[in-house]
């Protein structure tokens, strides 16, 4: 799903299997409306397909997904050198330090917890996007 289409904009890939969480993330990105183009993949497999077709400036990825989870996706994208220099931020409900550490080892540059509080999530995600993308 492409939210907008403009070649001059920064391009973000959101990888999220749950429609509610994907919409939650898109709402948090509304602050950047007009300066970003957002594609959504429903799992790691779909994300890899999109990564072969288009360059992204930032990737926001859930860890727990069907077909191919975030960890497996990171392993394959780095192995195939897909978007290997693109900042990848993990968005997850997991509080496990082991998940955070493994994500870092696989190349994630940041880790944002998806809380049920939209304002808190929005604030954390917006700050992280600004930090890594300069929008």
Language-model segment annotations:
Residues 65-68:
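Receiver (REC) domain active-site loop signature in two-component systems and cognate sites
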Residues 109:
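Short, glycine/charged-rich "phosphate-handling" switch motifs in NTP-dependent
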Residues 116-126:
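C-terminal output helix
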Residues 40-58, 122:
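Acidic, metal-coordinating helix/loop segments flanking the phosphotransfer/catalytic sites
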Residues 9-20, 25-29:
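Conserved acidic segment of CheY-like receiver
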Residues 62, 92:
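Active-site residues of response regulator receiver
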Residues 55-58, 82-87:
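His-Asp phosphorelay/catalytic-motif detector in bacterial-type signaling
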């Amino acid at each position: 799903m492409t939210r907008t289409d403009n070649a001059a904009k920064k391009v973000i890939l959101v990888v999220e299997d749950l429609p509610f969480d994907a919409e939650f993330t898109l709402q948090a990105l509304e602050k950047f409306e007009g300066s970003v183009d957002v594609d959504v993949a429903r799992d790691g497999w779909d994300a890899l397909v999109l990564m072969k077709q288009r360059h992204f400036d930032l990737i926001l990825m859930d860890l727990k997904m069907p077909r191919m989870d975030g960890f497996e996706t990171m392993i394959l994208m780095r192995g195939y050198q897909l978007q290997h220099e693109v900042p990848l931020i993990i968005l997850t409900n997991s509080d496990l330090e082991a998940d955070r550490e493994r994500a870092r080892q696989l190349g994630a540059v940041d880790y944002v917890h998806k809380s049920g509080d939209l304002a808190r999530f929005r604030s954390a995600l917006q700050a992280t996007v600004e930090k890594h993308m300069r929008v």
